[in-house]
């Protein structure tokens, strides 16, 4: 038993050193990318190669960074975008199923799962198999604590950017854990299909069967929304879709990058990948009020809505928020809403922030930021204020909904939702408990590991 613990400790120490070196190399590569010039191309290749090799958490961290223009510059963002399409495919063949057969080569490969196309033998229809990569759960459970420890150490020593990176790791933790169970994704996908059945220009593939590590669904071909020629109709539809998600239905697709939003030849939207869903049903009324208040310039209304949402840090922040609202309204009318917003210290500076954002609001902001970028591609004159005004009727309807009706709606959804989806929070929290245990164990060897790392680096410099 002691020997096993020693071996495990040694293995985790080695992995921790590997992650520490990766973080150091990434820090150096990002600085080279930011400088530009010929050396930046080599740095970009090194960054993508190192991130792909270190594993799923590094890839996910990088993808989360792509929505944080307050942390990462434009050059680095373009490099990070490559990680959505340059994840090496797994080498194992797809599993055998009695009623299905699969092509050996995957049609898509992500950090957590691989997607194969195949045929259903009963009717020869095209289907899709999504499968969690082998051993990815074990890798996540081991690496998350080590990333946190390495970044904690870097933060302690005042390494630039360590605090923001630590924040990113903590942000992506719930999504990572939720994406490990494809049975939960299948239930969420079916729930979305039911909720959005009334939208004629939206398709959500039908799920045929699912288990914890696999999901088989309808094959719906399309092209990426950003592969379509810029079209204002697509911009309006995407905005309308996310307005409905956020303030009407209250369930929001949390990973709306271009690969997960397809366009069919007739202009119909196709949504893929429901591994991460944001539930804001209990807050959608306040979000609607906040949007309306911003548009009409009601500063007190904005503050009240944000207080109802529980996102203002303290009483002292309210006065600063009121001063910032005119700036925010002006920024909402600009073409580069996200870029300009990221320049306000009230949103970005660790010392001056006025918001205490919970995980779901962080994901909501991230999702809407990505959507904003896609909308701006299709409508160069995009203005958030202008678009919101077109949906005043929807916003007014939500603002007037009594709180008891929202409670009834959530309760109704809960009662008709399969047990496996109801237990999603329990699953995530149990995994977080496992990770907390891993962190406690890893901290015991952190000092030794970090000392060894410093010693090795000093020897290399001599």
UniProtKB/Swiss-Prot annotation:
**Would you tell me the Gene Ontology cellular component terms?**
membrane
State the signal peptide span: none
| InterPro entries per the UniProt record, alphabetical | ABC1_dom, Kinase-like_dom_sf, UbiB_kinase
Cite a single GO BP annotation. regulation of response to reactive oxygen species
The recorded induction information for this protein reads: Expressed in the early phase of the viral replicative cycle.
Q: Name one Pfam family in it.
A: ABC1
**Family named by the database record:** Belongs to the protein kinase superfamily. ADCK protein kinase family.
Protein name in the entry: Putative ABC transporter A445L
| Source organism of the structure | Paramecium bursaria Chlorella virus 1 (PBCV-1)
